Amino acid sequence: GHVGADTAAVVLSTGLGQTAELEAGDQPTPSPPDREWVRLVVDVGTNAEIVLAGRGRVLAASSPTGPAFEGAQISAGQRATPGAIERVRIDPTTGEPRFRIIGVEPWSDEDGFTKAAIGTGVTGICGSGIIEVVAELWLANLMDTNGVIGGADTRPSTRIEPDGRTFSYVLFDPTELGLDGERLLVTQNDIRAIQLAKAALYAGIRLLMDHLGIDTIDEIGLAGAFGSHIDTIHATVLGLVPDCDPDRVTSVGNAAGAGATIALLSGSARQSIIEVVDRIEKIETALEPAFQDHFVDAMAIPHRTAEYPCLSTRITLPERSTASAVGSERSGRRRRRNGAAR
């Protein structure tokens, strides 16, 4: 597996080892109040490293998310460099997008964007951008819970156009903003790549929750270069992580690097992490039969069965369709939609 020195450094810098050692009375009050505080930290990368602490235990696992979160396997994907779309909002009434690119302060619908973007251009979509656009497509009802763009229960939009046997969403058309460059589409294959990645991550988390015997998490930290830049609300909408109080889903930055620095500067910290590492229970996701079941359920957006009551206090979520089961439209075949504007 990929649980090693990086994970140990994350545990050190985030204090997960201390969380597991605290008595219930020394921790913030969870809900319900008769149980101990549970913390989750995820270092998001090609292999996500997951650490869950609570009930006097620390559990860790690695989940194979692949490179989609870093812009790879995405048709217009790229690294997080100037010109890359990093933030996206889609109007739920019109279906029209607005976005922000790295290196340019105004959003695409604000004065000054075109002038500022001439130097960089709009070159692609980075990891944080693809997370937001997929979540926004679902929130705007342009994509169904199975991840199908232009699904039978979604609403029509001129931004959705035929693309072979499926549909794609037009995120950027340079002619609309007076810029050079090519159109940027979000394709059905892009959606599927993100679904596979996020399902692997969620399944790994859920597996650790099963081993700890819990159904809720009180605090979530997103670590790593990618985890530091994604919007936590959109990450939860997509279903990267289980439901949690939105105020307690935060970025913890380069936790592995911070932990390495602490270990270099403190002998007592090095001794502490040695002791904690001996107590960490490593779970091999590949050997767990339940992993596949969790993975399949997590392919839906945000999830096939899990509820998100905490998230619902912050953002209005679409009603979950019961018309079709997850996987019923996995073939990706293009379907005609009545009244769809093309």
Please provide the spans of the model-predicted regions:
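Catalytic phosphate/nucleotide-handling subdomain of diverse soluble enzymes
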Residues: 54-59, 73, 206, 210-277
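Short, surface-exposed loop/turn segments at secondary-structure boundaries that line and modulate
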Residues: 109-111, 164-166, 170-185, 223-240
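Gly/charged contiguous loops adjacent to phosphate- or pyrophosphate-bearing nucleotide/cofactor binding elements
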Residues: 131-196
